[in-house]
């Protein structure tokens, strides 16, 4: 199992299940070349897994989170600070004081068994980003800079127009 969490604050052209939500809302990065619109923002993804992964495979797992971020429409533009961190809770890979006192054998998941975790992290990261966006509220920050929450009613309309989230017969 792998479980990402992500506080999302980044720019891009929002997509939900392939639907061009950002374009249809008229709220997206680079919508008008002459507009003085700041790109950037940041995203941080933290991934916890109970799989026994080596430090090398944890780095590989963390990199796969950005597949999910990209699926939401982020281009990870210049000025964007994008980070992913993965850690394992499996007892087999824990570095306890006893294990640090001498040579040890670490039993970790072999490379040829990790692809399903890569897929899971990409999909779960995409969902974590959507969850963060859908739970966000409008806010006013420094210098009265205001960010509006996604209009959920409009989001539902856009998704329905694209046949997403509608009941099938």
What are these regions (language model features)?
Residues 1-169:
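A structural signal for small-residue-enriched, beta-sheet-centric alpha/beta enzyme cores
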